[in-house]
Amino acid sequence: MAKKSMIEREKKRQRLVIKYAQKRQQLKTELKTTSFLEQKVNLNRKLQQLPRNSFPVRLHNRCLITGRPKGYLRDFGLSRHVLREMAHECLLPGVTKSSW
């Protein structure tokens, strides 16, 4: 189980990404359309002044239940350990143990 502080930090980053997504997209489109160097510098400066944690690159996928950052499966939003346990308990519809 991940520390509560790490899980909360990640949630805060997700909120910031959502909050500043529209503003970031607007600045980036303006930056692409302008041809004046001075305007580009100003727009780039505004883009850099956004909070550091509002950049989507800083997000890290974590398990919804345990908060584990490694062994994360995107399709389920769970780590491999939790996925295995839930599949054995038949809590995931359509997931079956493979046999060949």
Curated annotation (Swiss-Prot):
One of its GO terms (cellular component) is chloroplast. Its main location: plastid. PROSITE patterns: RIBOSOMAL_S14 (PS00527). Transmembrane segments: none annotated. One of its GO terms (molecular function) is rRNA binding. Part of the 30S ribosomal subunit. Binds 16S rRNA, required for the assembly of 30S particles. Belongs to the universal ribosomal protein uS14 family. This is Small ribosomal subunit protein uS14c.
